[in-house]
């Protein structure tokens, strides 16, 4: 009767430990030593049986009739004695210290002597250490040592972050084969195929005479059928390295013909002789292999991974982040948001980076000023929130804006005793990941909104020290380091929605000194004038406005409704409205949407392949 799996595993582990401990004890006491490895003057006594059991390299040596395999002392060349010492220690103990400094040497020696267990440990270590600065080196190492697992992991890392890595000069040191291995991948995270062409030509121009010869082969990995015809005509065919190469022009003509529907006859791919059966027929896993029909590589029109981006309304709350696609009326689960504070402000930058700030963060290490606010960034690759340097000043009811590489956190109320209204402006520098102070606002304000347009930051409305709603509008020019007053709003308000829509700044609903309002105003940045806009159907506070693909949406907020007792109380609404530009009216498209409660809303471009449809 067979033993249960768990018990059998326990017995196996016990026996392995007993055997390994016994072998190590014999090594320590020089018992049954029948082999000495000599490396650069250092000697390593060991057992032939142990080496043969762990390494096919040594097994083949000892079982051969070669003179070297019969010697007790074996000289090894091109090996570092310290590295070999670590490997022998691992063989006898299963213990090895791998660091960023020694991993490549250990990896190479393990590969040389065919020790799969150490090889696997090194691969796992390098996979965990993959980063922007080493991914290309690890990719090349994986190819050099013929390790597909490592090479593919590093290549996928490069493909995911292609925009960033293609900026690094090291990328342009890749060999033609290495470059092809990257750009031929379906997982390339790019929106437009033109980016691949531009990177390839930049690579070729680095060593023009030498690399131009490789372009006909490399062009097979560029998916020209995904590139607009005008771009091919005006950019590709007119490039200095292309227009003088007849072979490249011939390939491009094939692409243009294909774009017009004139595809060449597909070539039948026959199985190789290695996979043929007795009668010459292709056999795969016992089944007959059908002949495949394939077009030339340059006519490949399979979409890249990064081409599955969609514009969505991104809803961020303390329970989860959900993406809503209004065009298809579909919701996608994006991320759990356990780190997101309830009272937060969100921001989507021009580069599609998503940030959240707010809440209360207590730092025990900072004895003088332990209170700060959370600051998080959404990681599109892992669909998770990354903790960024916290906001130095804990505050609420502030606004977020952006210009170039800076994020501005403006005004608000201090989360300390007294709840002082602030005029201070904090500036987060994205390249250096550091907070600093910027020019203060000319007045103290909270409950306002902030929008960004053409690298200018606008502050609108809110309440001042006297708790009265403001009409005031200011704009900050980061290049001139100055604030400037603009034409005031028609209605003083706070806690309202705002967005930039078709070049104009819109503000909607909110709280006035006499109650809620449903009025909407539009500010023309060119004329510095406000004009009335179609009213929202209901008076609300904290209504969110989102402009996406030329369409204006209004989401959620709080309205005053009558409860069962006849009392009028603020009620949160989770509906979505769309503005009909032709008929100039608001149309409800969803009565209630999940996860909208307590959420903030931004327009974001998200890859639907990374999301889970709800």
UniProtKB/Swiss-Prot annotation:
The keyword ATP-binding does not apply. Substrate-specific adapter of a BCR (BTB-CUL3-RBX1) E3 ubiquitin ligase complex that acts as a key regulator of skeletal muscle development. Kelch repeats lie at residues 353-405, 406-455, 456-503, 505-550, 552-606. Component of the BCR(KLHL40) E3 ubiquitin ligase complex. It is found in: Cytoplasm; Cytoplasm, Myofibril, Sarcomere, A band; Cytoplasm, Myofibril, Sarcomere, I band. Keywords: Cytoplasm, Developmental protein, Kelch repeat, Repeat, Ubl conjugation pathway. One of its GO terms (biological process) is positive regulation of proteasomal ubiquitin-dependent protein catabolic process. One of its GO terms (cellular component) is I band. The keyword Cytoplasm applies. Signal peptide: none annotated. Residues 33-100 form the BTB domain. SMART domains: BACK (SM00875), BTB (SM00225), Kelch (SM00612). Belongs to the KLHL40 family. Residues 135-237 form the BACK domain. This is Kelch-like protein 40. The gene is klhl40.
